[in-house]
Amino acid sequence: MTQITEKELKKKYLDLLSQNFDTPEKLATEIINLESILELPKGTEHFVSDLHGEYEAFQHVLRNGSGNVRAKINDIFKERLSTKELNDLTALVYYPEDKLKLIKSDFQSCGQLNVWYITTIEHLIELIKYCSSKYTRSKLRKALPKQYVYIIEELLYKSNEYQNKKSYYETLVNQVIELKQADDLIIGLAYSVQRLVVDHLHVVGDIYDRGPQPDKIMDTLINYHSLDIQWGNHDVLWVGAYAGSKVCLANLLRICARYDNLDIIEDAYGINLRPLLTLAEKYYDADNPAFKPKKRPDKHERLTQREESQITKIHQAIAMIQFKLEIPIIKRRPNFEMEERLVLEKVNYDTNEITVYGNTYPLKDTCFQTINRNNPAELLPEEEEVMNKLLLSFQQSEKLRRHMSFLMRKGSLYLPYNGNLLIHGCIPVDENGEMESFEIDGHTYSGQELLDVFEYHVRKSFDEKENTDDLSTDLVWYLWTGKYSSLFGKRAMTTFERYFIADKASHKEEKNPYYHLREDVNMVRKMLSDFGLNPDEGRIINGHTPVKEINGEDPIKADGKMLVIDGGFSKAYQSTTGIAGYTLLYNSFGMQLVAHQQFNAKEKILSEGIDELSIKRVVDKELQRKKIRDTNIGKELQAQIDILKMLMHDRYLD
């Protein structure tokens, strides 16, 4: 094979590029355009985390931009509209289809409705003009409803300096109304406002968990205009299951059974659980209190006795399979240091006791019918067959394939973005704040390098789904439960103890020292430096652990260098946090932390227009307004400019 020199490669590259810019005018126009964009204010970033399958609350936060929509409406209309009119306009932007129906039902005549249409279209056009003031026309055009781009642009950029176009603009709007297009235009404008108030969304982990509709969240994210994802521990569990890890699959099925969410598996992803139910009906009883499903906050009707019985049996069956499947992984991976989690081997089946971490406990609510005392890891032939069928169904689900592929494409374990470090869980450290080391495949890694190796193995496992017990697949499970995992952030997962031991002291899961050291500004500065970020300007944006505001905990830690934004979307945590969690806004002027009240129902917003979200706290104000030049995108644009200037000098100026 002929070696190509760097000079020849550069010439070939410039030759290809010149095909797009075959005149100096075209090239100059592109350079001027990109250089100008660098001077625009940076767009608003919106950070959310720990969605936990709570679609209704999540989509509401997306619609209101964590209060950004109402703030823009107040900026323009507060002095011109009454409180009721402001509330109605806000609700219309949030839920245009629903609010339109309510508003239209109030009018007695077409004439009154038409006047409202004209006024509302004017207000929405004015709002879009304000929300898009820091965008190029090209970027704004992409945010507008395609079928009405021409009409909207005419209204946005209308100029009537010489009174020549007055009737033209009036006819535009009147014809929209006369041809029954006003509803669709208003709906399109409302969604354009939602899109314009947030330039980029960061999802800092855990789309999945105990909530009822993670699939709907995934569909929403797939259609979102610009985002990235930092994987959470629950996200990686689902990725692992799809990638071939039977123990990850057993874990997520157990969680779905525990929280009465098996309809995610059956209805949302079309996976048949009948073989698992048949196995469960054969071996397990319905009266085991430890395995009865938790009551779902969003479900008003109770489970029937038969439904509860079936879920209780499935819950036991899949838990036992999970504990069995963990044993061979722990044994073939001594570097995981998980010998204490060989729980089925530590049970004394004669005395019904277990000895873990040097303590012996009596066991309750046991269901060891399928355990071979001499070989606890052994799966029954039926259990093996059920897991093979379930794994095949998981990997053949088209919807799940689409969702998991999107998670891989848009996701990562951590992300340096615009000077900040986004990470769901933690950076594993010891009590002295030194990065903890972990051995993988004969090499020792810590800090950023360890996270990079973890991510490499997640991607390798995903690409090689046919391998179910290789190192990469085992490491995906380790990320869910291992002591040096950046996602788990604890020393051990005490699932077995929570089911079978009454003494709650055995349930305690010791957190990585990271979680108290992150209060120390010097520690956070060191972490930022270790990840190649400027400790004077950067921050760590963290999810994973609910902030217990009810107990006085502050989400702003280490003098503002650490921001914890576990969204608290999960209803299960709201009694311990006192709120529905936090989101973060970062625009060209600085950062604002937004505290949310519990989202109850959109009906109240539609009828009253009062949004119970948000108390904003300014984290900081930029001394100098940030421009696109100062962002990740700015660096990419600058690289493009440098190449285009190189082409200009090579072809047209020299």
Curated annotation (Swiss-Prot):
Disulphide-bonded residues: none
Basic and acidic residues bias locations: 298-307
Swiss-Prot/TrEMBL keywords: Carbohydrate metabolism, Hydrolase, Manganese
Protein EC: 3.1.3.11
Needed cofactors: Mn(2+)
Ribosomal protein in keyword set: no
HAMAP family, sorted: FBPase_class3 (MF_01854)
Name of the protein in question: Fructose-1,6-bisphosphatase class 3
